[in-house]
């Protein structure tokens, strides 16, 4: 069955991997990327549409015929500049995406959240992520899949010095993180993307939450199709 995927946040680290994973899947005949700037990628299945979050209704044409919506939006407090702007990117925009997707007839949404997401958390970041999860679930899509990764590894287009330092530490400690600590291991962005696409293809209904260790299991193992398509490991995949 031919499927159309829409990716919001496709210019980011995880989103970029999601786009590449989708393009090599035979089940997806159309891959639409909605963002504020275009991707520098050419592919016969790839379509792109610029979105103005102040006037999102002007971009609803991009969602026509959508089956699966992948939301990979996210920022940092440093980049956002304020708590209000952070909530806008990490909560308001994903919820708006889900609403537009439902109106367009989307069957499922797959969204990147974060480890520790909790609407009752005292930590602003975790609380915002938890509130976003609750709001997404309340929209009532046939299926909602929420992914809660730990520190995400990969080459970003912008420098995040705090994350860079944490990455060095997490890589050094990775071999020591066993037992209960294993669930906190940093995870390559490619693993998250691969897990999201595989879960989408399974087409399970309802609301599902995937913690970091489960994401790693689903996204780590390459299938014969992955190998033939050339979506193999990156340097960070061995973490």
Please report, for each region that a protein language model flagged, where it lies by residue.
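NAD(P)H-binding glycine-rich loop region in Rossmannoid oxidoreductase-like domains
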Residues: 5, 40, 47-96, 100-103
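Residues at the starts of beta-strands that form the adenosine-phosphate
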Residues: 4, 28-30, 47, 107-108, ...
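Short, polar loop motifs at secondary-structure junctions
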Residues: 33-40
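N-terminal Rossmann NAD(P)H-binding glycine-rich loop of SDR-like oxidoreductase domains
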Residues: 3-25
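Conserved Rossmann-fold NAD(P)-dependent oxidoreductase catalytic core, especially the SDR/UDP-sugar
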Residues: 80-84, 88-133, 138-147
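Oxidoreductase cofactor-interface core, primarily capturing Rossmann-like NAD(P)-dependent enzymes
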Residues: 24-27, 44, 119-223
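SDR active-site strand-loop-helix element
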Residues: 8, 34, 72-73, 109-115, ...
């Amino acid at each position: 069955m031919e499927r159309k995927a829409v990716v919001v946040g496709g210019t980011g680290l995880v989103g970029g991997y999601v786009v590449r994973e989708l393009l090599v899947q035979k089940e997806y005949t159309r891959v639409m990327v909605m963002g504020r700037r275009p991707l520098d990628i050419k592919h016969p299945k790839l379509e792109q549409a610029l979105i103005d979050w102040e006037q999102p209704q002007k971009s609803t044409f991009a969602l026509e015929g959508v089956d699966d919506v992948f939301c990979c939006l996210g920022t940092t407090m440093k980049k956002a500049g304020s708590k209000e702007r952070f909530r806008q990117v990490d909560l308001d925009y994903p919820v708006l995406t889900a609403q537009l997707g439902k109106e367009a007839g989307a069957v499922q949404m797959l969204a990147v959240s974060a480890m520790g997401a909790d609407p009752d958390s005292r930590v602003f970041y975790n609380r915002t992520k938890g509130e976003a999860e609750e709001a997404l679930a309340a929209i009532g899509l046939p299926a909602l899949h929420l992914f809660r990764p730990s520190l995400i590894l990969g080459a970003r287009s912008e420098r995040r010095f705090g994350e860079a330092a944490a990455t060095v530490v997490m890589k050094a400690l990775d071999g020591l993180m066993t037992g209960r600590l294993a669930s906190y291991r940093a995870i390559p962005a490619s693993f998250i993307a691969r897990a999201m696409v595989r879960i989408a293809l399974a087409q399970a209904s309802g609301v599902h939450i995937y913690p970091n260790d489960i994401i790693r299991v689903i996204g780590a193992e390459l299938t014969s199709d992955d190998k033939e398509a050339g979506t193999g490991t990156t340097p960070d995949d061995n973490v």
